[in-house]
């Protein structure tokens, strides 16, 4: 059974590249893509993936705000943060809110 994934990133090339990599692996199914935090939260109301790949720096609602909303609404999803931010403060905030992994885009 494939792991259901949602990709949330404001860059369409990043979303498309991640989708292609995951689908080539074969054990993953990208069930949704979101271009910002608000879009992500709307799509989470429709269906909950097993894993959410989440960018931090996005317009309208950033990834840390999405993390807090997910925690507040008690949405059961594993979250991997993908970001260019390598500053410790972002990692600590994300870990404090509750993430399952933190990957740098470098």
Regions found by a protein language model. Name each.
Residues 2-14, 18-22:
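Conserved acidic segment of CheY-like receiver
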Residues 8-9, 34, 52:
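Conserved sequence signature across two-component system core domains
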Residues 9, 55, 83:
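Active-site residues of response regulator receiver
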Residues 27-35, 43:
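Short hydrophobic/Thr-rich beta-strand motif most characteristic of the beta2 strand and flanking loop
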Residues 36-39, 62-65:
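Acidic catalytic/metal-coordinating carboxylates
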Residues 47-53:
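Active-site beta3 strand of CheY-like receiver
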Residues 58:
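Receiver (REC) domain active-site loop signature in two-component systems and cognate sites
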